[in-house]
């Protein structure tokens, strides 16, 4: 076996082992995320070892033919499963995750097809002299691999968009890099760099996902306060509008229905805010029952506010205890962020007073009708 390839495989396995330990010891990943990354890293390591075995036993005495066949079968069969394990770590609410079970079924069907065609050498063959060769339908393996990578790319971009992640476009060059490397490997099979590249990209994917999740508020899925503070520094230069939201009488919800129901209310309100504003700006939870949105311009402000109230009213038909939400806004005009926030807060408090006065007037009107 080529010493260069042996060194690459050793580096590959060391990196994967390190990533497994890092994943297991992580305090920021949940159980599902840990499981997905651990399975992906372990599977990549196993396939890397299988590739070493195929190279060692290829051309060896015919007694090793069974090992050559088995190693190639498992290597070609399990390769498309690597992107599936990486999709598994993504948020379960993502639309693209709904077809995950179908993708797993496709992988199972592919494994059965590969096993059934072994005697005919359609995808690959190992001669009686124990020599490996690609089959006439080797492209089926290539198609499965590219389809799995495409699925991972689309799933990640969709999830990143749902999480309002600004770096989601970085997924495209990563996918293109792996696709180009695969083409080179197909054209020059003696290089044996595929799994080193897959390992590199899986590590980058781990970093990308960790960064994406670290920007989120765990309860609501909106961007968190740290993201807000970093973004407002940019808004001071580029301009825009700060919209702040406060949940009316939220303490009463917690006191009357408990904190679990209060958390449900916050999650529902956050979802409505994101649906109303996400296309025009970035949505944040900056503490307790306080939310804010950084809009790119003032033109969409009124329309988004109207949409939010409509969404809340619709959601309140199902979840009756959902409280009202007051909002205030202020435009960035070059001054300090604190000053902009102060103006937005003053507008918010004025809106809350108007909301309370309106609610009191409606209650008084209802009481008058009952008395009459």
How would you describe each model-predicted region?
Residues 275-280, 304-322, 350:
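Short catalytic/binding micro-motifs of nucleotide second-messenger systems
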Residues 3-11, 116-151, 185-191:
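Extracellular-loop-to-transmembrane junctions of the mid-late helices
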Residues 19-23, 85-88, 142-163:
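Alpha-helical transmembrane segments in multipass membrane proteins, preferentially the mid-helix core
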Residues 8-62, 68-85, 103-121, 170-186:
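Hydrophobic alpha-helical transmembrane segments of multi-pass membrane proteins
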Residues 224-241, 251-278, 284-288, 292-293, ...:
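Conserved long alpha-helical elements within nucleotide-processing catalytic cores of c-di-GMP signaling
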Residues 309-312, 326, 330-372:
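Catalytic-core segments of nucleotide cyclases and related cyclic-nucleotide turnover enzymes
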Residues 155-157, 161-219, 226-240:
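Signal-transducing coiled-coil linker helices
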Residues 24-37, 88-100, 157-167:
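Membrane-interface helix-boundary motifs at transmembrane edges
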């Amino acid at each position: 076996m080529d010493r260069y390839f042996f060194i690459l495989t050793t580096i590959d396995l060391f990196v994967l082992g390190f990533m497994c330990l890092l994943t297991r010891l992580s305090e920021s990943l949940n159980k599902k995320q840990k499981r997905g990354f651990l399975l992906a890293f372990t599977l990549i390591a196993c396939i890397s070892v299988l590739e070493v075995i195929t190279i060692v036993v290829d051309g060896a005495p015919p007694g090793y033919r069974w090992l050559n066949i088995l190693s190639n079968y498992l290597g070609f069969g399990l390769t498309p499963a690597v992107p599936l394990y990486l999709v598994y770590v993504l948020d379960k609410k993502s639309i693209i995750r709904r077809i995950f079970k179908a993708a797993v079924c496709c992988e199972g069907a592919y494994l059965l097809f590969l096993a059934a065609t072994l005697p005919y050498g359609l995808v690959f063959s190992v001669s009686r002299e124990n020599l490996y060769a690609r089959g006439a339908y080797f492209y089926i393996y290539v198609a499965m691999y590219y389809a799995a990578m495409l699925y991972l790319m689309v799933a990640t971009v969709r999830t990143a968009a749902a999480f309002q992640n600004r770096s989601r476009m970085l997924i495209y060059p990563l996918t293109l890099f792996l696709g180009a490397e695969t083409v080179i490997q197909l054209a020059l099979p003696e290089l044996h760099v595929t799994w080193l590249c897959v390992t590199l990209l899986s590590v980058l994917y781990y970093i990308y996902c960790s960064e994406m999740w670290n920007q989120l508020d765990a309860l609501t899925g909106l961007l968190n306060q740290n993201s807000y503070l970093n973004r407002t520094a940019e808004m001071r230069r580029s301009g825009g509008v700060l919209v702040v939201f406060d949940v009316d009488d939220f303490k009463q919800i917690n006191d009357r229905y408990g904190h679990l129901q209060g958390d449900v209310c916050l999650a529902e309100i956050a979802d409505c805010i994101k649906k109303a504003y996400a296309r025009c700006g970035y949505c944040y939870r900056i503490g307790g029952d306080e939310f804010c949105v950084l809009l790119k311009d003032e033109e969409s402000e009124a329309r988004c506010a109207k949409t939010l109230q409509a969404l809340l009213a619709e959601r309140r038909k199902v979840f009756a205890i959902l409280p009202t939400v007051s909002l205030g806004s202020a435009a960035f005009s070059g001054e300090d962020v604190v000053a902009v926030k102060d103006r937005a807060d003053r507008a918010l408090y004025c809106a809350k007073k108007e909301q309370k006065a309106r609610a009191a007037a409606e209650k008084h009107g209802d009481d008058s009708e009952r008395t009459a």
